[in-house]
Amino acid sequence: MHLEAVSTRANVTALKNPNWNQNLFLMLLFGLTATRAWAAVPSANSVKLVTQHGYLPDLPVLVRVEVLTPQGTRDWSLWDGEAVLSVDSGAVTLSTNRIPMRNGMGSTLVSFSGGGDLNLTATVGALHATRPLASLAGSPITTVGGTSAVDAIWSGVVRVTNDFTIPAAFTLTIQPNTLVLLDGVNSGTAGVDINVNGRIDVQGTESDPVTFTCSSTNSNVRWGQLRHSSASLATAPVSTYRWAAITRAGRAPGEGHTGQAPVVRSSAARVRFEHCSITDHGVTTPGAAGFGTPGKIGYATGSDLSFDDCLFQRARMGPEVDGTALLFTNGVIMDMRGPDDGDGMYIHAQSAGQTCALKLSVIAAGDDDGLDTLDPVVTVEDCILRDWASVVEDAKAISVFNGVTTVRRCLIVDSTVGISAKTSGSNTTVRVNIHESTITRNRTNVLAQFKSNATGPRIDYRITNSILWGVADSVASDFGETNFTIGFCNISEPWPGTGNIVSDPMFVSAANHDFRLLAFSPSIDSGNPQSTADADGSPIDQGWITFLPGPSALSHPQQMPDGSHRFDLSGYTNRQYVIEYSTNALDWLYLFTSFQTNDPSLMVDPEARNSPMRLYRARLAP
């Protein structure tokens, strides 16, 4: 007779409880104990609430809410949600108490009337987070403007009454918990600007962020822009914005795509944004006065930009970059609205030696293209692109116009067209590489599109290890099938190519936007066998997310006459499992790795001889 135990973190803890002494004794007595596969008992998700530490009555404040997994990443499985705001002061009234959320992220502008210190709480389902906000009414205000002839340091409440310029070789430092109020106008292009010809260092923190916003409580009044420029990119200093909210700008001259004003204008400059929110620079309600004006997120020429953990929301369009290196990681772009060109991002050709990449990000909900391109070489990895569904604007999640775009491990859904590619003439080409991605629930998943003077053979799609599912015409061309080379894909229509299948991919719940694969989906292990294997040693799957089987189980323990131990491992086939052992249920050591070819498989531990107690557990590699 042998005792079986489940080795979870909770039960290992229980073994140290005095009430379990008898069971521990039985383990010692009987020796071999088989265990199920273990997994750390996860903590619950959590809510992160980011907003400025102090506020002025009736002046809108950006409130950003995120739902985080126990690993600290945004919970993308929270496809659509809502955060509810509340305060603990009966003397304070909120302009709104609801924040729509997508994939674990949402924000809105909230004004607090009545005054007084308060605690602001954001609740998402059963989760909540609270932050104190102190009233800044009556606080001293520093007034600035003009050109600074020295390094400048801002703190507290700062009001910029006319254009402020920091010259070359000088630095503007903005300390944590600074509220920067810029004077604005209700029409035209004469809002107050900050011109950075030298360097800016915004030193916000999560608990004490920096805010740039308009000094007026009138929502139609907006300031101008943040303008970065230098003599050359090679000698440009690096400007940094950390934990900054930049809201209610755009009264500046229009430039580039859409002709609207860029809130961040960069020319031959190096600018880094970390944990920033650039929001509320345009009218995004259809039919409202000024719809689609006056601001877009940014416009850069000849520059080097990076954005990490940044939110762009509620503007005419996201950033437009030309001849510029761009890295956008762990970010969210939402709600780019307006008549024509309400794009999430627009990337032109970069300069020699520069790269453009978007990674680990969500690009959701706009009136035109999630990502629009003109001639660049760009990589999109580990992203969700969703809800670019306007029929009027011929919307696409990704629009590729010349150049090379590579899409890897992405989910592209609920758009008019998933990916469209076109060229401008007989002397231009376009290449689209799609690997390990899921493109589904779009009117058309991939399209080779006609453009004036274009010829079909110059559009070249290479698609592997992907799922293109959900519409009768999943792969469409204005020219012919020769635009597409497709292999080892699951497509909702027959298509020539090695390894292609037409079979329901068995999503967990497409209706609820859960596009993971169910066990025994035909897309599991069905990718190109020459591709790099998945981390657990199995052949690569088709689609954007690797299938993870359920817990394995160890059973039927036996102690053989020679003292060795045997037991069965039951787990998903074609996967590597790591077996570990312990003599005290607390300290675990590696024993061996086994490739599961049959279910169950016999495991043998020849080193177990003369062990007073031996516990085992198994997990999926690596």
PLM region spans:
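Short glycine/acidic-rich loop motifs that flank beta-strands on beta-rich extracellular proteins
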Residues: 161-165, 183-191, 215-217, 221-224, ...
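Core sequence-specific DNA-binding domains of diverse transcription factors
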Residues: 40-138
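Short, composition-biased motifs enriched in small/polar/acidic residues
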Residues: 549-622
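Predominantly extracellular beta-rich ligand-binding scaffolds that present long acidic/polar faces
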Residues: 141, 382-387, 397-514
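Residue-level detector of buried hydrophobic side-chain packing
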Residues: 174, 212, 244, 489, ...
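Surface-exposed loop/turn motifs in large extracellular/passenger domains
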Residues: 167-173, 197-209, 228-243, 263-275, ...
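Extracellular beta-helix/beta-solenoid repeat scaffolds
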Residues: 155-224
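C-terminal accessory segments
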Residues: 498-546
